């Protein structure tokens, strides 16, 4: 039980600290990459949706 509670605490702690990344800005030398960086968190969702499209193409065997 203690392991589960500590795991939940670690997840919440990492979530709180990771949310500060959303307001972080890239250095000026990499400012031209801003549009790409904005789209990057959505890329794993495309793979998730691709799995459903693939299964639909093979009739959910």
From Swiss-Prot:
Membrane topology: Single-pass membrane protein
Highest taxon in the source lineage: Eukaryota
InterPro entries: PSII_PsbK (IPR003687), PSII_PsbK_sf (IPR037270)
Propeptide residue span(s): 1-24
Pfam family, one: PsbK
Entry keyword annotation includes Secreted: no
Gene Ontology biological process terms in this record: photosynthesis
Stretches that traverse the bilayer: 40-60
GO CC term (a single one): chloroplast thylakoid membrane
Keywords: Chloroplast, Membrane, Photosynthesis, Photosystem II, Plastid, Reaction center, Thylakoid, Transmembrane, Transmembrane helix
Entry's localization field: Plastid, Chloroplast thylakoid membrane
Role played: One of the components of the core complex of photosystem II (PSII). PSII is a light-driven water:plastoquinone oxidoreductase that uses light energy to abstract electrons from H(2)O, generating O(2) and a proton gradient subsequently used for ATP formation. It consists of a core antenna complex that captures photons, and an electron transfer chain that converts photonic excitation into a charge separation.
Family of this protein: Belongs to the PsbK family.
PANTHER family to which the protein is assigned, alphabetical: PHOTOSYSTEM II REACTION CENTER PROTEIN K, PTHR35325
Subunit structure of this chain's protein: PSII is composed of 1 copy each of membrane proteins PsbA, PsbB, PsbC, PsbD, PsbE, PsbF, PsbH, PsbI, PsbJ, PsbK, PsbL, PsbM, PsbT, PsbX, PsbY, PsbZ, Psb30/Ycf12, at least 3 peripheral proteins of the oxygen-evolving complex and a large number of cofactors. It forms dimeric complexes.
The protein, known as: Photosystem II reaction center protein K
Organism of provenance: Cucumis sativus (Cucumber)
Lineage: Eukaryota, Viridiplantae, Streptophyta, Embryophyta, Tracheophyta
